[in-house]
Amino acid sequence: MKNEMLALILAGGQGTRLGKLTQSIAKPAVQFGGRYRIIDFALSNCANSGINNVGVITQYQPLELNTHIGNGSSWGLDGIDSGVTVLQPYSATEGNRWFQGTSHAIYQNIDYIDRINPEYVLILSGDHIYKMDYDDMLQTHKDNLASLTVAVLDVPLKEASRFGIMNTDSNDRIVEFEEKPEHPKSTKASMGIYIFDWKRLRTVLIDGEKNGIDMSDFGKNVIPAYLESGERVYTYNFDGYWKDVGTIESLWEANMEYIGEDNKLHSRDRSWKIYSKNLIAPPNFMTEDANVKDSLVVDGCFVAGNVEHSILSTNVQVKPNAIIKDSFVMSGATIGEGAKINRAIIGEDAVIGDGVVIDGSKEVEVIGYKEVVGVPNED
């Protein structure tokens, strides 16, 4: 695809609804599925779609994300004609540092985009779990002679009020956009994935800034402006698995759905692999008393207890007689002897003491990064 289309991943979200899990890292850097971070899905989709240049726009707590992405080699994006560029906010002459919205983040990086000089820009969110062929979406964009194409997912009517809803004609041309409507007319929900003709979007963003017109957000400002001016705006209809993991409940659900031979994400599909930074760890070890059922156990784990329908990430320790059920345990965590974990997310390097009970039967429980529970303070 060469430089025909540049992908820009919006990865600066703080993810306040994830609570303890994002106190020290950005939401796209949160672990998922045992060996991944959430942003791996967008990056892998880019690599599998033949996109050579990717800009990752960061903001909140970017260190872990920057370290994880590195030079892009884990996704094959470190070649002579390809690359991943991490783009951070900067202090502009008018004093703005933090991005004011999704499209404002693009405006602040116009110089970078112009250097790549793409015909199209693909705007992505770095905090969704899904697989998508962006090249197929681009072909739809071209076939419709569109200036903007919005990826949409058909959602249940009762959930439509949570999304930006696209009302279309019989040819999938968008005639109306409603942001979280109280009484939705359609069930076509925006996925926050857009393809724009770059020259046109560039003009819209620059003119908006020059004339004092708020163009800071794609959903609130840019899409309505395109429709009002009669631009050709179409949908790309997606029918695969897609999950917004912006809440504790949805992150837990997505991990539980990831377990199993027939998971909806088709994680074992060799034709569309999800790549990540390779971590060096020894093989996992299970004692003769260990009992592991219907679970994912990643390299480096030591298991001497009971694990059922759960995910153990890299280098997790489960001590004797511990019971873990319906839970996601992030890398480096230690589960003490006789501890009982049910419907929980255990953060990276957390320590759960001997005999501690964490029960999320009513509401998913969360233990944060390096949090220590039930271990006496040596001081």
Curated annotation (Swiss-Prot):
Class of enzymatic activity (EC top level): transferase
Pfam families on file: Hexapep_GlmU, NTP_transferase
Protein EC: 2.7.7.27
NCBIfam families the UniProt entry points to: glgC (TIGR02091), PRK05293.1 (NF003670)
HAMAP family (alphabetical): GlgC (MF_00624)
Quaternary structure annotation from Swiss-Prot or TrEMBL: Homotetramer.
Record protein name field: Glucose-1-phosphate adenylyltransferase
Organism: Streptococcus agalactiae serotype III (strain NEM316)
Gene it is expressed from: glgC
